[in-house]
Structures are given as C-alpha cells and as structure tokens.
Design a protein with these regions (language model features):
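Signature aromatic-anchored transmembrane alpha helix within multi-pass, membrane-resident enzymes
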Residues: 8-12, 211, 215, 282-289, ...
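Short hydrophobic/aromatic helix or loop-helix immediately within or flanking a transmembrane segment
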Residues: 33-41, 53-77, 92, 138, ...
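Transmembrane-helix motifs of polytopic, lipid-linked glycan transferases
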Residues: 84-109
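Perimembrane helix-loop-helix junctions
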Residues: 149-172, 181-214, 315, 327
C-alpha cells in the first residue's frame, strides 16, 4: 500500500485540525486507560485505576503515548508537549485509517465506491468526534483497516501473497494485543481463508506470528508489572468468567442494532443496512455481522466496542449510495451528497467543542493556577482527566473512586455500592463520616479518609447542597460551562470550583 502524496497530507491536516480543536470529554478510558498510565510511567506520578493494580491491562497501548511524553520531555516542550503531543500522534493514526479505508475500497470495489467511502469517513460525525481520541479502540480501528489492505479476501484470485499475508498478521496480532476482542473478526476471516485456501502453510504462519507478538507483549508486560502476569488472561477472566464487566452497566441484547449503529453512522445508517444486505454473501459482511452478534451476547455493551468496524460500515453505506438512481444525474448527485454530509456538521462540532467541555477546562485551570495547593473532586468517578492534563506534581489531588466488587457472593454483589455511589446516596452523611468539620482542628484530620482541600470541584447539580454544608468556608472562584443537557443527573450543570477561605 503506497501513500498517495496529495491525499494523505490533506487527511492528516484535517484530522490534526480536529484533534487540536477538540475540547470535550467523551468517556473515561480515553484518559484513564491510555494517557494516565503513560504519564505515570514517564513522570512518576498520577493515578492508576484498579485495572492496572490487578494486571488486567497491557502496557502496550499506553507505551505508545509514553514514547510521546519521553520525546516531549527530551525536547523540553513542557506542558504543550504533554497536552498536544498525544493529540498529534492520534491524528496521525486517524488519518492513516482514513487513507487505508479509501485504498481498501478502491482495491476491492472501484473508484466510485472508494470516493463515496472516503466521503462517509471524513464527514462522519462519530468519526470526527472519536477517531482523534486516545482510546485503544481508535488505534484498533487503524490497525484493523490497515491489516485488511494486506489480507487475502474472497475477491483475491490465485495464491495468497505470503508477504502481504504476513504484514496483515502482524498488524492483526498487535490489534488483538491492544484489544483482545479484536480476535473475533480475525477468527472469522481466518477460518474463511483456511476453508477457501485449504493450506497448512497459512495456519502455521499465523500461529508463528501470533506467538511471536504475544510473547513480545508478555515480556513487555512482565517488565512493566515487575511480576509474572498475563493481562489477556486476567482480562478474559474478569469480563467473561467472573462477568464483572456488568458492574459498569447492562444493556439489552438489541443495543448495537437500535442504539449503537445509529450513533456510529447517523445519517448513513439506512444506507449501511441496505449496503450490508446487498453484500450479505461477502466474507467481510458476514464477519461484521458475526462480531456484532457476539458482542450482543455480552451483557456490558458500549458503542465504542464496535467503533473499529466503522470504516467497513462506511464501505457498505457507499455501496448502497452507489446504487441510488438519484446519483446517476451529476447535479442531483452532488447536491444530495452535500446535503447528506452537511447534516453531520452541527452534531460533530457541538460534540467536539461544546458538550462536556467544562470537565476538561477545569483541568487546564488547575494546571495554570499556581495558588492551588490541593484539589478534591466531589463528582462521579473519572469525570475529568487527571495528571495527563493537570500535570502538577506539587499538588495533592483526590476524587471519589468506583472500584468494582471482587470476591463477593452473589447476594453481596447485588447490594454493592462503590465510594461514589455511597456519596450520592447521601452526600451530607458521607461528608460527615469521611471529612473532619469544615472549620475543625487540624488534629482531627488523621481520623478521616479525606481532608478539606484548598479547592473543591463539583457539578452544578451539587452546588446548592455543598454551599449549604460548607457555609462561608468555601466561596465560588471559577465556573466552567459543561453541558446544556446530560443523561446523568449527577453531571448536570456547570463545573464549579470552590476556593477555601483563610481562617
């Protein structure tokens, strides 16, 4: 796969512009499972969530951003390198995915469908919003579509090109290391290839490359954790055997069909369903259906779990668009496509620049305000980025945790409440039990889990209650708009910073 010089720089410039202007928050894993471990690894401070203490996560994905931090530190780029370095790298990954899906569609479906695929990809609101974020799913998407460019699909005639096949296997194995569930699509494609080719060589090569990549990853993880541990095994045990992923939410079985796909595809969703129906006999379409079906059997579901398939979904949408009679007339074609694409613009811009921006803005405020000595977040857990954005080794910071239950009976699991739950069940009781008196003697502090910090951060939904509880001990010193509406009542309103008054 050779880069088209005019196209790739344009795509990179486009994704860079999005990455550097995105100011909002989507889901915690963008920070807490990627940038925070990387920041802690390089700078030696921060917070590692329970997954890292239990060895559920491979350091492979955070290591990518740790390299960015190391280079930034070497070049003395300061805060700018810490904040913008990962964004630049992720924009490169996103642009590579854009270019790769274009070349893949061109290779297998022709110029018209490849152009329509590229249109869907660059105008997708969800792609605009998520592809430049540092989720492992985002890099998984890039690796998947890059690997497919080298994979021998059912339209490939003759013998398998073993060099291309080897490249595909390496990329696929790395994707599976980053996200173990990526093995679903590759297992389907692999079995289909074996059935079609009936070659022992392709099986042994897959086994050899898979073993090498897994062994290297195991070595890196052992060096990181300083103990013999296998995150892939721990991950599967937690999510499948113990089924504790359901602690983070349970969705109905049709979630991916009726909720996730419309979120991913927005205006392109009817064309996707039509296109995948047209292509239902192809291995790629069947692989996508298989992956969505298996994911639907797992109780905990999230839209970003199938996000890596979005480039492929755009191909199926393009296949449908290509069949529309209205597109046979040039003037109507471009008018229709332009209107269709423009429908995504308001959603993409609002999600990237406005909705949930306060929780990111407040970390910039903390980073750039030297007078802040300590800060506490009375919010649902992981509501903001952490030291990857605050980058302050000189302050004491805490937040309410939400670690899942481990080693409890089924009856205990049903009634388990994490720390954040306990706080929101009865905020005043929690504050009395875990904090000293607001204006109390400092000798009392040791008896309590928390001390009152120099600054408190809350959502507007809690503002009235907190003001009533702390009285004149704290005053509002900064406010950041966060959202117009929010599905979680605990997160509604502005992000408000309270400053402690001197005694």
């Amino acid at each position: 796969m050779r880069f088209n010089v005019p196209l790739f720089p344009l795509l990179l410039q486009y994704r860079l512009q999005i990455a550097l202007t995105t100011k909002t928050y989507f889901q915690p894993d963008e920070f807490w499972q990627a940038l925070e471990p990387a920041h802690e690894l390089v700078y030696g401070y921060g917070y590692l969530t329970w997954e890292w203490k239990e060895g559920l996560r491979s350091i492979a994905h955070p290591m990518v951003f740790a390299i960015v931090y190391w280079v930034s530190d070497l070049l003395r780029l300061g805060d700018a390198g810490v904040i913008y370095g990962p964004k630049v790298l992720q924009a490169l990954f996103a642009a590579t995915a854009d270019y790769s899906v274009y070349k893949f569609a061109q290779k297998y479906y022709g110029d018209e469908i490849s152009q329509l695929t590229l249109m869907c990809t660059v105008t997708s609101a969800f792609n605009y919003f998520v592809s430049i974020r540092t989720f492992s799913n985002s890099l998984e998407m890039t690796l998947l579509i890059c690997a497919l460019n080298f994979w021998p699909l059912d339209k490939t005639a003759g013998q398998v090109n073993m060099l291309n096949y080897s490249i595909a296997l390496v990329l696929a194995a790395i994707a599976c290391v980053l996200r173990p569930t990526n093995i679903l699509i590759w297992s389907y494609l692999g079995v289909a290839l074996i059935v079609r080719q009936r070659s022992f060589k392709i099986v042994t090569l897959a086994g050899a490359i898979g073993t090498i990549i897994l062994s290297l990853n195991a070595l890196v993880d052992i060096l990181y954790y300083q103990r013999l541990t296998f995150p892939l095994y721990n991950f599967l045990k937690f999510n499948i055997v113990e089924s504790l992923s359901s602690f983070y939410g349970v969705n109905r079985q049709v979630y991916y069909i009726v909720e996730a796909l419309p979120q991913l595809l927005t205006v392109y969703v009817p064309f996707f369903f039509h296109g995948i129906y047209i292509s239902r006999s192809s291995t790629l379409a069947q692989a996508c259906i298989f992956v969505v079906f298996v994911y639907s059997l797992i109780s905990h579901k999230e839209v970003r779990f199938i996000f890596p398939l979005l480039p492929i979904f755009h191909i199926f949408a393009a296949i449908s668009l290509c069949r529309l009679r209205i597109l046979s007339r040039p003037k109507l074609k471009w008018t229709f496509l332009a209107l269709l694409s423009l429908l995504n613009v308001p959603l993409a811009l609002y999600a990237s620049t406005t909705h949930q921006r306060g929780v990111v803005d407040v970390t910039s405020y903390i980073r750039t305000t030297p007078s802040i000595e300590s800060v506490g977040f009375l919010m649902p857990c992981h509501s903001t980025p952490w030291m990857s954005h605050m980058h302050r080794p000189d302050i004491t910071a805490w937040f309410l945790t939400c670690e899942p239950p481990r080693g409890l009976s089924h009856s205990e699991l049903a009634t388990y409440r994490d720390e954040a739950d306990q706080f929101y069940d009865d905020p005043e009781l929690f504050l009395r039990m875990h904090f000293p008196a607001v204006t109390g003697n400092q000798t009392e502090v040791a008896r309590f889990r928390y001390d009152w910090p120099s600054h408190l951060v809350v959502f507007g939904a809690l503002e009235e209650l907190l003001t009533s509880y702390v009285g004149d001990a704290y005053v509002e010193c900064k406010r950041f708009f966060n959202s117009h509406v929010h599905e979680d009542p605990r997160r509604r309103g502005d992000v408000v910073v309270f400053c402690k008054q001197n005694d």
